[in-house]
């Protein structure tokens, strides 16, 4: 793992993350113009970072947040579509891979159902090689139709890549799912705003450590008239240490080289902190010394996960017992979100 140079090598993947300024757009024409700006940025970045193999832009960077529902449906796109064609041409021209946000992608039953919040991974030939739909939209605010699975794709120089989006990353399950599928780099594109800056910085580092995986975070910056975005796009080593991190500057860029051989050697040979291996070989030292084989215990010890897999409604019932039974809360009502009880009277 290296930071500070502009190069890369046969063993390292050059990764750039962009603190893209959150756009405030309203029409398809404005979206296309912004996509062209992103494309021009890619070509310029490659000139300054000749080792760049992969460039990552934040959630909402292409379309911004359409706070108007009508505008959200009017600007929802298809994949492939005009935006991805612009990005594909830029990736070919710059000879680099890219991760791009489409908010939103038209639902199969468009316009009768809400769009998806989608990322695409485009290779240096301009081909879309992964399309990921956000599994856990940021409720109650986001109205995206939820996706249902994660993916792993072989990326530049053979590194295995998974994509996740913003609020997805608050749930350890999604990181573990990607890592257990073989991901070596988990890309988290986010449009995260204050006040959750410190929590999100910690989450990315912790999940890198817990899953023995590289993490690249691209976050928005600026103020779009509603939210203020904190940036801090970063590249994090599989040991949880930050290789490079932006501040809050608009359109700031960080760059690092992540080693293929180092992560693969670690996963093969590390012992006390090899979290992926140890989870499925629990207590192997004690099992060996007890004469019960040399593999440890593989069975899942966690009641919640067993219940969730075998009886999702029962798992939901259990969580409602310790939280609440309605989607909304009368203490802080949000329009369109059902709740029980009277609204809390405002204090005088």
Curated annotation (Swiss-Prot):
InterPro entries: Aliph_Amidase/BUP (IPR050345), Aliphatic_amidase (IPR023719), C-N_Hydrolase (IPR003010), C-N_Hydrolase_sf (IPR036526). The active site is at residues 59, 134, 166. It is an enzyme of class 3 (hydrolase). It comes from Geobacillus stearothermophilus. Coiled coil: none annotated. Signal peptide: none annotated. It catalyses: a monocarboxylic acid amide + H2O = a monocarboxylate + NH4(+). Residues 13-260 form the CN hydrolase domain. This is Aliphatic amidase. The keyword Amino-acid biosynthesis does not apply. Optimum temperature is 55 degrees Celsius. Keywords: Hydrolase. Its EC number is 3.5.1.4. PANTHER family: ALIPHATIC AMIDASE (PTHR43674:SF14), NITRILASE C965.09-RELATED (PTHR43674).
